[in-house]
Amino acid sequence: NGRCCHPACAKYFSCGR
């Protein structure tokens, strides 16, 4: 849970995980 591909989200979630 946490599909984000931008820096603001990637710092908490991995892009594509």
Swiss-Prot record:
Protein name: Alpha-conotoxin-like Mn1.4
Keyword set includes RNA-binding: no
Protein role: Alpha-conotoxins act on postsynaptic membranes, they bind to the nicotinic acetylcholine receptors (nAChR) and thus inhibit them.
Domains (record comment): The cysteine framework is I (CC-C-C). Alpha3/5 pattern.
Lineage: Eukaryota, Metazoa, Spiralia, Lophotrochozoa, Mollusca
Propeptide residues according to the Swiss-Prot or TrEMBL record: 1
Disulfide bridges in this chain: 4-9, 5-15
Domain of life: Eukaryota
